[in-house]
From Swiss-Prot:
Keywords (A to Z) from UniProt: Ribonucleoprotein, Ribosomal protein
Family recorded in the similarity comment: Belongs to the bacterial ribosomal protein bL36 family.
Protein name as it appears in the record: Large ribosomal subunit protein bL36B
InterPro entries given in the database record: Ribosomal_bL36, Ribosomal_bL36_sp
Amino acid sequence: MKVQPSVKRICDKCQVIRRHGRVLVICDNQRHKQRQG
């Protein structure tokens, strides 16, 4: 999980979602997991 000031999709399978007021990127590739913070 990377914590970054701005989250971006890295590949086509990345999905940007909001959970509990946080912006997350979830993906099949675990290296692409990101959280905004």
